[in-house]
């Protein structure tokens, strides 16, 4: 589970950084399409984190 924890933590920290960047873009009144693209990138990382949490759950809680 430790490797899963590290991977999930890394993904969530990446997502946090992306969301903070999006917030800064909004505050700076940046171009909407650029903001949307960054939001899509953040969503993709959150989806990966979601899948990793589910995979870890299946591997450790359901199967174990």
Regions found by a protein language model. Name each.
Residues 1-64:
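Solvent-exposed interaction patches of small proteins and small membrane subunits
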